[in-house]
Structures are given as C-alpha cells and as structure tokens.
Amino acid sequence: YRLEPEGEEKPGVWFEKRTEGGIDVRRICAPLRVSAVDYDVNGEGFGITAEFHNAVGNLKAVRIGLDELSTAAEKLRGLGLSIDEAPGARQSRVPDYLNAVFQNYKQQGIPLVRRVTRVGWLSDQFTAFAFPDGVMMAPGEDSKERYCMDLPEGAPSFEVKGTLQQWQESIGLTALKSDRLMLSLCVGFAAPMIQLLGLQNSPGVHFYGGSSIGKSTAARGTASIFGSRFGTWRLTDNFAELVASSHNSLPMVLDEISQADRKTMELLYMIANGRGKGRMTTKGGAKKVFTWALTLVSTGEQTTDEAKREKTGKA
C-alpha cells in the first residue's frame, strides 16, 4: 500500500500487487492517513485515528477501534470518504490498509497516545488528572506520555471563560460576603478530593428556600470552578448516569428539584452511591457500568425530603 497525497497520479491510497503479467496497481480510496494510535488507561482497547477530507472538503478525524476494522470501510464511507470500491464489497482493502499502517506505526513515526474516556483521576495511583478541556495534569513519569480525550457521545460539554484573576475579583471576593456562595465553592473544590480520601459515596449540598435568596447564584458559583454546565433535575436514568460519569472528580450542579418526577427522585441515591445500573447488551453480555466520585450541588424551594414526599408519597 502507498499513500499519494498529491502528485501526478490521482491522490489517494493505492494498492500494488505483483502478478505474472507485471504489477497490478489500483486506487482504493481518497487520501486517508492514520494520525495516531491509542490505547486505554488499562493498556488495552487499541485503536487508530484516521483523517481524511470528506466530500465537501472538510477535514474529518475518526477513531476506529482495532476490533472494528472489519467494518471500517462502510463507516468511513458514511462519513464522506470517497472509496473506489463498490459499497458492500466482500473484500474491501480499506481495513487491510489501516491494519498494515497500525502494524508499522513506529516505523512511520505515528504517535502512540493514551486514550482518556472521562475526566478526573485516571487511576488509583492519582498520578494524572484529566481536565474537561483536555488538559492533563501529570507530573513525573506520566508527564512524558501523550494523551487524547475520547468522551462518550452525548456527554455534556464544559466551557472555559475569562481568567483566574477575573474569577477571583468577581466570584472569589463576592464569596467573602456570602456564606451560601462560600459553601458552594468549598463543595466544588472538594470534588477532586473524594477519591483521594477514599470516600465510598459522593456527598452533596442542597440549597432550598424561597426565590431571590441566592440559591441559583451559589450553584452557579460551583459550576464556574471547572466550567460545568448548569443542569436540571429533569433527567432520565441513562442520561443521569452519563452526566454523573462525565463529572467524575468534579462538581455536578442540578437546579430546581421541583422539575424531578417520581422516578427521578431515586436518582439522588444513585448519584450518591457513585454507580449506575447494570444492564445487558443485545447479545446477552454485560454493558459497562458507569461509575463516578463527585460532589453534588442541588437547588429548589423544597427540601429533598419534601420533594420526595410530593413526588412519591414517601418520606
């Protein structure tokens, strides 16, 4: 296989095969390069990142697990890669090409990176911490590793705004005059310490009372620390687990507990327990269970007991 990004020949990936009559040369697809080889925090789950320009000229970067290579051609075609082979070809050369590149990634100078699938501490050794924006805090030997973020599809995003000085002058100074805001900030800064302290449950604080007493302001203060999204209690089981896992080692903010329904109230216990529900795959295997260690800040006009009694009829 050879990649021709440009030149006299039509750009693309070409396959050459020696035959009795000479050399059979044919184009497989448009230019397709592997920009990285990755593995997970357990040293398993290897994959590659494939880059190409789609039909409208936009550069696409797609992660493909090595266990997914057999279906790589159809996946890439669906994302806009021009493939010369007919759709559904029984023996597509695209997976073979990608596998050949993987087998020789060191010789080709392709970087090997550690894939991070969630934020927070990466192991029980507490030597590396992944921030939501992809920045890694990894002193010592771990600082020599290269990392890439690969958060689950649908995971809530985080946002970075302003500078540390602006935060200190606005939120920090205001907290000196507000007990609620100060407490909410302490809860937020405590989140990365939960695993370090070996706590089994995820603690939290619920601010309740009438309007205009600073509940939402306090919660927004918590969200400002790591750029968390200001969530609500209107959640399903599945999405709540995804949101909680995406806030591992970080504070999670849920506003207005009155929006919770009867089933949602049970999520309060699930979030505190730090573990989602066990589920089966369509093939009868066990799906990966979401886990987390976080701090929770919640708001509402009612206490959690009052809200639960209203929704479920039980205290």
What is each model feature region?
Residues 206-208, 213-264:
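AAA+/P-loop NTPase substrate/partner-engagement loops
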Residues 189, 255, 297:
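Conserved RecA-like P-loop NTPase ATPase core
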Residues 1-175, 242, 247-250:
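Conserved glycine-centered beta->alpha loop in an early N-terminal alpha/beta scaffold
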Residues 178, 193-196, 238-243, 257, ...:
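Generic recognition of flexible, low-complexity loop/linker segments
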Residues 139-141, 261-263, 305-308:
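Short helix/loop capping segments that flank catalytic or ligand/cofactor-binding pockets
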Residues 142-228:
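P-loop NTPase catalytic core of nucleic-acid-dependent motor ATPases
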Residues 200-201, 246-248, 290-293:
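Short loop/turn elements that form and flank the Walker-type P-loop nucleotide-binding site
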